[in-house]
Regions:
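Conserved acidic residues
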Residues: 1
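A conserved beta-strand element that flanks and buttresses the S-adenosyl-L-methionine
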Residues: 4-7
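A short His-aromatic
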Residues: 11-14
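A short glycine-rich, Lys/Arg-flanked "PGG" loop and its adjoining helix->strand segment in the class I
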Residues: 18-34
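Short "lid" loop at the C-terminus of a central beta-strand within the Rossmann-like core
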Residues: 40-45
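Conserved Class I S-adenosyl-L-methionine
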Residues: 46-82
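A C-terminal cap/extension of S-adenosyl-L-methionine-dependent methyltransferases
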Residues: 81-129
Length: 129
């Protein structure tokens, strides 16, 4: 049993709606099923971001409490890697107007973003307490 999305839930209109989608999609999985989702991730600012609109940008402060909530509910969430990387291409940012066909990081408004992946396994059985 498996759910997957690539750069989609940041287009639901707000940070809150994106996180709600992640929680609700778990209901479609059987116990022990897996969900893998990627989204835009703000690496330049953990305070200010695009919180609503056509594209939102998630921050560590949005992701971490959500992950802790999932774990508290008994789901497994793979450890997240927030490192920026150490290779030369990790330090290149595709700025507006976007010219590079391939990029690891790009500018959206005043923010530098990359993709982050969430790997979630639905709890294997229902809790009775």
């Amino acid at each position: 049993d498996f759910n997957w999305s690539s750069c989609s839930f940041e287009h639901l209109g707000s940070i809150e709606k994106g996180l709600r989608f992640l929680k609700e999609q778990l209901k479609t999985l059987k116990p022990g099923g897996w969900a893998v989702h990627t989204t835009e991730f703000n690496i330049s600012n953990n305070d200010k971001t695009l919180e609503d609109g056509d594209t939102v940008i998630f921050r560590m402060r949005d992701i971490e409490p959500f992950v802790q909530e999932l774990r508290k509910d008994g789901h497994f969430v793979e450890e997240l890697d927030y490192s920026l990387g150490g290779l030369p291409e990790d330090f290149m940012v595709d700025v507006l107007p976007h010219q590079q066909k391939v990029h690891l990081k790009l500018q959206l408004n005043e923010f530098v973003v990359t993709s982050i992946g969430l790997i979630i396994q639905k709890r294997k059985r229902k809790r009775f307490f």
